Amino acid sequence: MLQLFYFSAIIASVILNFVGIIMNLFIMVVNCKTWVKSHRISSSDRILFSLGITRFLMLGLFLVNTIFFVSSNTERSVYLSAFFVLCFMFXDSSSLWFVTLLNILYCVKITNFQHSVFLLLKQNISPKIPRLLLACVLISAFTTCLYITLSQASPFPELVTKRNNTSFNTHEGILSLVVSLVLSSSLQFIINVTSASLLIHSLRRHIQKMQKNATGFWNPQTEAHVGAMKLMIYFLILYIPYSVATLVQYLPFYVGMDMGTKAICLIFATLYSPGHSVLIIITHPKLKTTAKKILCFKK
C-alpha cells in the first residue's frame, strides 16, 4: 500500500513539474514579448522574466533526473547524480533569491513609510535591479561552491548501484549541504517575513488613515497592498514546507524512513515552484489577462 502511495507521489511530482515548466515558459514568453514590443520592461517584470528562466531550467533538470532515475536499469556514476544535485541547488537558490528580491521590490514600492531609508530605496531600487539580479546569482554560486568545497572532505564513491539496490552514503555530504541550505534559506526567510510584516503594518496604517478621513478605505493603494501581501503570504505557506521537505530528503535518517513519509516529502518538495508560479500568474494583471485569452475565458 505504501509503495503504491509512493509511486503515486512520483507520478504527481512529474505532473506538477510539467505544470511548473508550462507556467514558467508562459511567464517567460509574455514578458519577453512585452520587452521586445515596447523596448522596455518594468523592474518587477524583469525579475519575473529571470525567475521564469531559472525555474524553467530547474524544473526541467529535476524532471529529467527523476525520469532517468526511475527508468534506468543500468549502473551510472554517482558523479552524474552529483552534477544534477549541484545544478539543481544553484538554480533553486537563484530562483528563491529572485522571489525574495521581488518581495523586497513590492514592499518598497507599495508601502507608504516616510522614513529616509524607504524614501531612498524608492528612488534607487528600480535602476539597481539588474545589479541586484546579478548579486542573487553570485550569492547562489557562492553557496553552491561552498557545498562543493566542504564536500571535498568526503569524496564520492565510484558508482551507484542499480535502482533497485541503490545505496548512498548520506553522512558524507550532510554537513556541507546543511550549511549551504541554512546560510541561504535563513536570510531569505528573514527578509521575506520582514517584507510581509512591513506590508501588513503599512496596510493597517493606510486603512486607519482612510477611516479617520471618513473615506472608503478600498482604493488602488489598498488593492496593491492586499495583492502583494497575499502573494508574499502564499509564498511563505508554500516555501516553509518546501524547505523542510528538501532538507529532510538529504538527512541521514531519510533512507530509513517509510515510503509514506518519503512520498509526503516528495510532494511538498515538488509543490512549491509550480504552485507559486500559478499564484504569480493569477495575481499579475497582465499575465492573468493573457492567460484568460489563451484559455478562451475572455469576457
UniProtKB/Swiss-Prot annotation:
UniProt GO molecular function: bitter taste receptor activity; G protein-coupled receptor activity
Glycosylation sites: N164, N165
Segments on the Cytoplasmic face: 31-46, 103-131, 194-230, 284-299
Keywords: Cell membrane, Cell projection, Cilium, G-protein coupled receptor, Glycoprotein, Membrane, Receptor, Sensory transduction, Taste, Transducer, Transmembrane, Transmembrane helix
First-listed, main subcellular location of the protein, grouped into a coarse class: membrane
Membrane-spanning intervals of the chain: 10-30, 47-67, 82-102, 132-152, 173-193, 231-251, 263-283
UniProt membrane topology term: Multi-pass membrane protein
Pfam families the record matches: TAS2R (PF05296)
Stretches assigned to the Extracellular side: 1-9, 68-81, 153-172, 252-262
Localization (cell): Membrane; Cell projection, Cilium membrane
InterPro entries xrefs: TAS2R, TAS2R4
CDD domains from the UniProt entry: 7tm_TAS2R4 (cd15013)
Any one Gene Ontology cellular component term annotated for this protein: ciliary membrane
Keyword Glycoprotein applies: yes
Highest taxon of source: Eukaryota
Family: Belongs to the G-protein coupled receptor T2R family.
Stated role: Gustducin-coupled receptor implicated in the perception of bitter compounds in the oral cavity and the gastrointestinal tract. Signals through PLCB2 and the calcium-regulated cation channel TRPM5. In airway epithelial cells, binding of denatonium increases the intracellular calcium ion concentration and stimulates ciliary beat frequency.
Miscellaneous section: Several bitter taste receptors are expressed in a single taste receptor cell.
Protein name: Taste receptor type 2 member 4
Organism: Pongo pygmaeus (Bornean orangutan)
Gene: TAS2R4
